[in-house]
């Protein structure tokens, strides 16, 4: 097999070992139980593979995201919503997402009907790159949790869309990996702050946006978070706190958004003080996520072969690693031996992968 074909196949395999989805939600620090089950409240995809085509309708709420979940959680303005991400299971040993998957964490919201159609998405939270720390690093440190505060919007049904953009392959067009789900909420308080028009998803990103096509292995001091500015009517949880201590995050327009990844400060908006009436859903078992490869209809990128096939660095374990699994890279601690007929290729300093020899 030609090396270019191997590279294309590896790109479509999505580096399946290190992905993540939202497993659960907390409201005002109360666990709402597993939401990614058949009777849950998250529009959960069939696997934890990322979306890499920013023009795909899967960018709205992921695969099957147009299908409503069984339940809807109730919240009120001022309530704190905490999203909890995991790789394979809601277990203390879960690695959340590979630490090589550097990138920003964002949250959008939209009225349910419009949001399901990919329209009127309003960004209410973002965290990117601050003083050498990526939002994904903070997410892992906080055991997969990040928080937002429910704005003082009119009563009704809304979708909240947490998102991770992993940039470990963002140095090539089509390499960024986007992870998102839509969580169903009913806002019971009746606020007077109307959501602005919002953006379309897909539509808000392009494959060549500075924050999508971004080389994390180059020298840089700041990172331009993709998409619109954070709505100035949003009051979102701090990006540095897993418990989601409340702080305001906003900007007045997309044009005023700077290339730094710090969350823009703005005057805190007033929120109602009513408390959540969410029905608590207790998990009956710990769900696990089976990682699989989702085929895509878009053409695989044609990329020149790496100039070096350096031996894996950082791996200390031994074992027989299967095709497309990680076998090395900076800070990698797992096994480094590929199965028979495979070789460990270096795609970048942080990620080496078993591919056909």
From Swiss-Prot:
CBM1 domain segment(s): 319-355
GO molecular function, one term: cellulose binding
Cofactor note: Binds 1 copper ion per subunit.
Cofactor(s) the record lists: Cu(2+)
Taxonomic superkingdom: Eukaryota
Top-tier EC class: oxidoreductase
One of the protein's GO biological processes: cellulose catabolic process
Induction: Expression is induced by cellulose and xylan. Expression is also induced on lignocellulose, such as steam-exploded sugarcane bagasse (SCB). The degenerate binding motif 5'-SYGGRG-3' that binds to creA involved in carbon catabolite repression is present in the promoter.
Compartments in which it is found: Secreted
Protein family according to the UniProt entry: Belongs to the polysaccharide monooxygenase AA9 family.
Region called Disordered, residue ranges: 292-317
Comment, domains: Has a modular structure: an endo-beta-1,4-glucanase catalytic module at the N-terminus, a linker rich in serines and threonines, and a C-terminal carbohydrate-binding module (CBM). The genes for catalytic modules and CBMs seem to have evolved separately and have been linked by gene fusion.
Official protein name in the record: AA9 family lytic polysaccharide monooxygenase B
Binding-site list for Cu(2+): 19, 101, 179
Record's keyword terms, sorted: Carbohydrate metabolism, Cellulose degradation, Copper, Disulfide bond, Metal-binding, Monooxygenase, Oxidoreductase, Polysaccharide degradation, Secreted, Signal
Binding residues annotated for O2, in chain numbering: 168, 177
Signal sequence range: 1-18
CDD domains: LPMO_AA9
Organism: Emericella nidulans (strain FGSC A4 / ATCC 38163 / CBS 112.46 / NRRL 194 / M139)
Ranges annotated as biased composition (Low complexity): 295-313
Region (Catalytic): 19-234
Gene3D superfamilies: 2.70.50.70
Biological function: Lytic polysaccharide monooxygenase (LPMO) that depolymerizes crystalline and amorphous polysaccharides via the oxidation of scissile alpha- or beta-(1-4)-glycosidic bonds, yielding C4 oxidation products. Catalysis by LPMOs requires the reduction of the active-site copper from Cu(II) to Cu(I) by a reducing agent and H(2)O(2) or O(2) as a cosubstrate. Active on carboxymethylcellulose (CMC), hydroxyethylcellulose (HEC) and beta-glucan. Also active on soluble cellohexaose, a property that is restricted to only a few characterized LPMOs.
Reactions the enzyme catalyzes: [(1->4)-beta-D-glucosyl]n+m + reduced acceptor + O2 = 4-dehydro-beta-D-glucosyl-[(1->4)-beta-D-glucosyl]n-1 + [(1->4)-beta-D-glucosyl]m + acceptor + H2O
Region listing for Ser/Thr-rich linker, in residue ranges: 235-318
One of the record's GO cellular component terms: extracellular region
EC assignment: 1.14.99.56
